[in-house]
Regions:
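Internal, well-ordered alpha/beta segment that forms a basic, Gly-enriched binding/recognition surface
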Residues: 37-104
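Generic preference for hydrophobic/aromatic residues in regular secondary structure cores
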Residues: 7, 61-63, 163-168
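Conserved nucleotidyltransferase catalytic core and NTase-mimicking acidic/glycine-rich helix/loop elements
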Residues: 86-169
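Metal-dependent nucleotidyltransferase catalytic core
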Residues: 1-58
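Generic alpha-helix signal with a bias toward terminal, lower-confidence helices
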Residues: 17, 21-22, 35-37, 42-47, ...
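Short secondary-structure boundary segments
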Residues: 1-9, 63-84, 123, 133-135, ...
Length: 169
């Protein structure tokens, strides 16, 4: 199997490097996100972010906390994270991106097969994450195929998983 370890480090000062990806073994990847503390204010902005908001709301493991900042921020973000307007907003971010990339896809056909295929797969990923955000958190590219069936079941659309597999195969 494979595993992703996501580590979010919140800094109280500007950061130079936003993201580091370190291959620990061929099967394990350490994905480190460096985020400035100011990004989390106001909390309603974080509720709209499918990646950062989800990192607070789906049982994160806290390694270090100074002054109860994390608990306060987590409670503030979770307070409205699952309200319909935020769920639809997060899903819409992925849906709109997939739609935009799809309209540009025909123009990329002449750029070469690797660019075209990469764009095609990104459209599928964004479409799947639009669905995933309706019931929970977005899926990483490494877990998308494995977990999409449960995402589709969560919104009572079991028919979506075979469609996804058909688009890939």
């Amino acid at each position: 199997g494979t595993a992703d370890v996501d580590l979010v480090i919140v800094h109280n000062q500007p950061v130079d490097e936003i993201r580091e990806i370190i291959g620990m073994t061929p099967e394990v990847t350490l994905d480190i996100h460096h985020i400035e503390q100011s990004y989390y204010s106001p909390p309603r902005k974080v509720r709209k972010d499918p990646w950062i908001g989800s990192s607070l709301c789906f049982d994160p493991l806290l390694l270090y906390n100074k002054g109860h900042w994390f608990e306060f921020m987590q409670a503030s973000v979770e307070a409205g994270f699952f309200s319909p307007e935020y769920v639809i907003h997060r899903s819409g971010l992925f849906s709109n991106e997939a739609r935009l990339l799809f309209t540009e896809l025909e123009n990329q056909r002449n750029l070469g097969s690797s660019i075209y295929i990469s764009s095609y797969l990104k459209i599928i990923e964004d479409g799947c994450n639009a669905v995933a955000c309706l019931s929970g958190l977005p899926l990483t590219d490494r877990t998308l195929m494995k977990r999409f069936n449960e995402v589709a079941e969560a919104i009572n659309r079991e028919d979506l998983a075979p469609i996804l597999y058909g688009l890939i195969l």
